[in-house]
């Protein structure tokens, strides 16, 4: 594998430990999806995957193992019959231990559901969602039922909802500047509840600072819950099992032990929550059992069963969604005999998965919603004339495909974003209400420029909240006919479920993105699962990314770190020996070299590094860059006017901005032209300096110049998707501060994307979707 042009081998003295603490045998990105510095005040940084999948699920800085494997028993069903349904013609083979356990767990789940139904009214779909997704779903249903107007969910007066009508062909007048918005804050905890929890924490020897987060996680009854079940403290972000054990011993004395049912149930939930931070929506049951055993649980099998019975987790069989195949009798098995191959297949173990109900409900709701869009769309639309006028063959193919399908997947690099823009413009020319939703404000701006109409581009968060876009129709659904979601790999399963539920029958949905970039910060892999399930037509762009940076990134996408010709110094390699030199050279590049050579000011250059910690992580780099570019005392909670920051209004959303001022209401930011006020109590937890970002934070955005910092101690945190994402953030110039020697080509060639365990793909494959890709 050839090195980058100008690359100089680094020193052999690579640090023994990288910033992630990952094992060399199984390197993974140092930054955990969903734990990107926005939760640093509460959550420890997650690191690379551990070599042992079980240890993976329990270590605070380890990536939970997905345990994914296609263990579906071909031709067999859980109840022991053959796939053709003829199992009654001969003695059925004995159930395997896993199959018997699955059947028993199914019966148990039925009893649990029956008991729940007797105690309370039926639970509406979506109640398993939480956080931003739950808030958005509640807002959608309140509007649908007429209980509240859409404007009730705006922090400031919102524009009146547009009636359902075809979009005018002529360009509309530009919108007035967006009103100042206040960053959403969690529901305030009552002083009484916080005081009660604080008293319990003090009694148990836990830090008083956990009082407010505990009320946020457990609700107003947190004090009572913690007193009766101290291990509920594990629901508070950042709390470790050993800390919860000490808290429980202080409160319960000798009345608790490692096999206490309250403890084991809380541990199961904790393991699954940790896995969700790494993107998994479920875990192999064996992985969970191993994690429990490492936490001194003597009978992990019983602990898992009890957790399922109590509703802490749900149990799934990998092949339980598959329908029996009744073709066997027609193929020579009319006598109903079970073939030896089928009998052997039925004896194969069934992979059992454990998952939290919020992600299970989200994946099931999303799968059903996508199938609804596929089957409800009018497929006889004639967009041939619009396709003929498309600016490229790939754009024409996308237009033709979208005309005949309710769900389409479009994949391509940065230059391929012109194709969804052409589709939106063509659809609006046909009188349809077509919009494009992006992951970031920067992506929204670039899409609006490509379409030529700023009103057609929104951020996904703005669309779902109602702050941007067409508003809702009289039925409470989004008032549109075609929606293109760009940056689709950044779409987590809960947000995707809320989005699809807000789309009416007949709406066309296009998921567009680059499969090579890092996945979503939240749990799930929606874009990859829809691609893998082949449940709808797929359009692969043939438009290459231009220039030396585009050529370099395209090679990385296929595992090759090629030499590229860069006559204009579009790609520059800066070798360094250690982290201290990496920080020094980075500051020099941003403040002097790049502005002088390319006339790109420092505020338009973005630094990207592997993780937040370490001698050359985002914190160290931001401190050095602030001292050089905007020194000051940090009189506004550590910030000064002119500081570049990143605002994290919700986990997984990083919004770059600049500090303008501060007053009694909070810290005032300018986030891509949108004024934002962050309340004082939220500044510490949701605002960080932003001259340097992690690659996850930078996903979905681009800058005129990017400086990627690769210190030697970050070598094991590199992967192909990480390098692909980081190197692709610069539009005109890319500098690589290179101190990882041969770890860079190794990562590109041999460290693919970290797998995530999800259920969306088999759910989609089991649903009837006539438009499935061949």
Q: Over which residues does each language-model region extend?
A:
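Residue-level signature of catalytic and energy-coupling elements of molecular machines
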Residues: 240, 288, 366, 514, ...
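Accessory, non-ATPase domains that flank or precede helicase/AAA+ motor cores in DNA-metabolism machines
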Residues: 2-70, 74-385, 389-392, 773-774
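Conserved helicase motor core of SF1/SF2 NTP-dependent helicases
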Residues: 431, 441-446, 461-466, 477, ...
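C-terminal accessory regions
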Residues: 671-774
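Structural motif
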Residues: 409-411, 435-437, 482-486, 510, ...
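Short, charged beta-turn/beta-strand-edge "cap" motif at the junction between a beta-strand
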Residues: 648-655, 712-714
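ASCE P-loop NTPase motor cores of helicases and related translocases
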Residues: 342, 346-482, 535, 554, ...
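Conserved helicase motor core of P-loop NTPases
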Residues: 394-406, 419-428, 516-652, 660-662, ...
